[in-house]
Amino acid sequence: VPTVDALAYNLWGSADVVCPLMDARRQQTYTGLYDFADGRMNTILPQCVVMIEEIVDKINELGRRVIFLGDGVDVFRDYINEHVKVDYDFAPAMCNKQRASAVACLGQVLYEQGRAENAADHKPEYLRLSQAERERQEKERDFRI
């Protein structure tokens, strides 16, 4: 179950666009955009890592009310307050952390859709390289020049 999707699932049934924000450091956030209709969660923007400016621009383009949640809310609250042009709100603090119940419920939905895998085939899906990997690539690039 993708982490950002599971965080969004904490607000299952919301009438608003749901925007999870997980602090990825350096003004970046792990995020995505979701809504709920016809008894299911729909992905507007799949989970990704972007600069906070990029997700705010996308939200403003959508033109719909949005609710933010996640540990990135506290990090980016001032930026959101200054730059989001649509109606928005922040989820209650109790919704800002991963919940095993949301992961399990979303996992069941994915299983019913045939999107299951066995433990031997499971591999984590990293949205970006680790800092050590990025620094190694940078050094290798500098060495080639």
Model-derived segments and their meaning:
Residues V1-K97, E112, Y126, Q131:
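Surface "functional belts" at beta-alpha junctions
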